[in-house]
Amino acid sequence: ASLKSSGASKKEIAQCYVKRAYTKFAVDRGSSKDFFLHSYLASLRPIITDESGVVAGLQSPVDTMCVAGTKSQSERMENTLYINPKFVVDELASGVDIDSATENIIVVLLHEVLHIAYRHLIRFAHIPVNKVKLTKLVNVACDLAINHQLEKITKRSISKIGGLIPGVAKTE
């Protein structure tokens, strides 16, 4: 039986997929040339949102996945990875086997890790959140730069995975 037919909620299914992706990336690539990316991924605190994607403290709902700098209980800044379970289950894992779903999730996780590695959270923190058009433009520019690198790293066509550029659907 598949995860989707198990009767579990999308949040529980997404948790399973994300844990599997983290583990597969660590086993397959954690000790190789991708150790740099693995160390960033391991430092992220993943939080699966509810399906609405609404998170207190974030300006807009999380439709896919996103990273944000947040203060921990010890008042230390840490990077948090917010994951919408609907995106994982209905987009990344839809119509594919579990191995393909896992690879799709790894690609999106790496996309988010590269936002941190390229210091996008810090580099563009000065842009006021009320400058919506500018914020979206910067985000798309950052996404395009990241996706160009991702195709080199993963040897996969990024356009076949949805959610890596806001508002742009995957191609068939």
Language model feature labels by segment:
Residues 1-107, 113-172:
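Short, functionally important secondary-structure microenvironments
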